[in-house]
């Protein structure tokens, strides 16, 4: 609000998890038995993820001003975050004095092999991005690391002249390789760790894990391709 003395919240940073955070003991939670021995610890429990996403939805709706939204979900890791975020956005819309139209489209970006980011990004799907012209676009991503992948996607989308583009990412990694890109809305800022769970995968494994966890070396080797 113009003229307000209150400091604007930093939506692009989110809940900050420090580098020395030891995480939660796996024995305090339930998780799939087929992953026993493959994980170091729970970084973010499922309940905290859900609560944080609910707050993100409120922040997004307040910022966008109850305008119609075209949601562009980045698959595959972003689908769970996107589904839960959209559901919360719809709940807010149901209780508002104005209907907010929300349409969802999907795109896949391939930039990881094993636990390493590849040099080039592959864009799969989203052939008809011309439908984004004049729309308020919300890109929903699972993890922002270096920022190069998201910058490349934004550059591609901007060609279609949307009215507005906002980026919501569940996680933002602190890494020396970052080019400085920050999403408009972030769930959590985390250390530069390779995390799995809540639809985040390691070579297609761990998507069925509800919590966000840190994979150990045994798990990396077990599921390496």
Curated annotation (Swiss-Prot):
Mg(2+) binds at residues 141-142, 201. GO terms for cellular component: cytosol. It holds the Pfam family Pribosyltran. InterPro entries: HGPRT, Hxn_phspho_trans, PRibTrfase_dom, PRTase-like. GO terms for molecular function: magnesium ion binding; nucleotide binding; protein homodimerization activity. One of its GO terms (biological process) is purine ribonucleoside salvage. Keywords: Acetylation, Magnesium, Metal-binding, Nucleotide-binding. SUPFAM superfamilies: PRTase-like (SSF53271). GMP binds at residues 141-149, 173, 194-195, 201. NCBIfam families: HGPRTase (TIGR01203). Has low, barely detectable phosphoribosyltransferase activity (in vitro). Binds GMP, IMP and alpha-D-5-phosphoribosyl 1-pyrophosphate (PRPP). Is not expected to contribute to purine metabolism or GMP salvage. This is Phosphoribosyltransferase domain-containing protein 1. It comes from Homo sapiens. The lineage of its organism: Eukaryota, Metazoa, Chordata, Craniata, Vertebrata. The gene is PRTFDC1.
